[in-house]
Amino acid sequence: MDTFNNTTKVVKDDLTKKIQSDSKVSIAAACFSIYAYQALKDELENCDEFRFIFTSPTFVAEKTPKERREFYIPRLNREKSLYGTEFEVRLRNELKQKAVAKECADWMRRKASFRTNTTREGMNNFLVVENPEDAYTYMPMNSFTAVDLGCERGNNISNMVTRLENPASKEFLNLFDSVWNNPDKIQDVTNDVIDMISTVYQENSPEFIYFITLYNIFSEFLDDI
């Protein structure tokens, strides 16, 4: 067993060592952020399989409409967690968001599967890395974001995560598998997740982003023209 305070000792650094080319990554968490993918891009691109369960109903109560959205302006804070949470604002301000979203969507089509809890029943939040010879469980993994990986600062006083090994880790993997394979409690939402992330790079052309950026920089001077 090991512990991570996510300040001087962070979960992300340990995951880069544990996730291998033949690893299977299984996560049960409240939300997924493209910036968590970015933090572990090399490892997730090379892993064998990635499974994610939204622990509360997501993409099932009602479809998110695909109406046109404005490019991100920090003070509006309108993006969903897939595009980054409120504590990943520094990352979202960078014009890399579009590129990250495209890379993430491409990876999802090749490696990832997403399912959601469709019930009102609660579920533990955790991440399991399964390798041929061992397995590691990180808990709690409340959300799969840059904050929960220790890459960014959130609004919690503490952000402690514990890593368990076998045989305890095997129990968490069995729990995940039992939920994953239960059609009465779980629904596949992989295409919904990919479609929503894809809108980031489909809706805003490079030229549009460029001119919106210029507008945000110089708008206060327009009245003087």
Task: Identify the function of each model-found stretch.
Residues M1-I225:
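PLD/PLD-like phosphodiesterase catalytic module centered on the HKD motif
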